[in-house]
């Protein structure tokens, strides 16, 4: 490591001198010698040239000292052919893969920042044109044209299909095409002009050169100037173009009827136009002519043999449109479901509060958490005690007494407590807590009870010691505590009669302790 203010080239010269002669360079300070020795382990001489191999000794980077060599390396790694320059990250990667000097990172940054070619290229920013979506307010004012295919060649030599969709009414016209040349598409568009008149704009998702050819043909055949524009101009929202139901059903129909798919395109168009659409709840036919068509035959869903071809087509179109509606929820449903999922995820991520994870009760011996500090990537806790739970407040906090019987000033949260389990090596003790006797948890007379037994059982068995002499419990509070413990003992004795002998053996030892204390 190079000390602050020291020349990096001088540092490398000192390392090279030490590796070559085994002695320190005359300019090396006494405080720098240990650093030179450590750094020299990462360098080796190969063919009278110094190479940096690193700690793992797997690298092989030539040490560059002179300024001329540095500029040559930077020029070779930054310029990649005529007119192509790398950025800072790529240039630094190329330099560090083969060369080494102490200030390589800063030198690469300064070299790229000072490059005139990079500055000119960076200042030339192509700003995307601002999109101005046209507002469609009248029928047949803005029309989109989509091309589909190639399909199976029909009996009339048609291979492609052209779909014209009115953005305001969703009126659909499907026409067959033999090819997708500009002249063929222009002829099909003019046939629609003769039926409904020319719209204000026709939007196509094609390249500009192809659109210019179509405009030339339309002007030659119909006299319309620049009526077709590109969808890339941003004049229409792509989601408002041809409905996906039309494209999906047309692809399916052409696959099922490879020879005659072009003969039924007018029927398909009319079937889609008399089918109600979701946003307005009206059919495109009604939006276009402000009236509903007079259908001579009501199409049946079953599509039996008695129905016409057009009726079967209308039934299939309505069925396909219903499937798409069922699969695609409404915008309000999507927003509500999204909000519900977000709320559920937030609730799931929220960690539940552990109010009393150890099920602690009055009389339990516990350790309390006093201090937290950060260590080894997590918080460490300091536990002090033991203390005894005197009572539990309405808010769920515990009031504790220490081993001298002194009540602590502040209540402690139950989540900041944990049970205190005595070690088997500790002596059997009995301490007095301001008028109430609390026995120790270490049972000499009960060898079959393992250490760490559930605290409720330990407290019940400890409570039997309090029955030895009721006269010792003078205060009313102690009397209530004794009755509570006796009730617990009676239930235990009825269910576990086998513990009676152990309990009385413990009573004898406790009597001796009480007589000694008295």
From Swiss-Prot:
GO biological process, one term: DNA integration
Modification type Phosphoserine: residues: 498
Residue intervals of the Integrase catalytic domain: 135-293
Pfam families tied to this protein: Integrase_H2C2 (PF17921)
Keywords (A to Z) from UniProt: Phosphoprotein
Renumbered residue ranges of the record's region Disordered: 326-348
Highest taxon in the source lineage: Eukaryota
GO function term, MF aspect, one: nucleic acid binding
Gene3D superfamilies for the chain: 1.10.340.70, Ribonuclease H-like superfamily/Ribonuclease H
Identification of the protein by name: Gypsy retrotransposon integrase-like protein 1
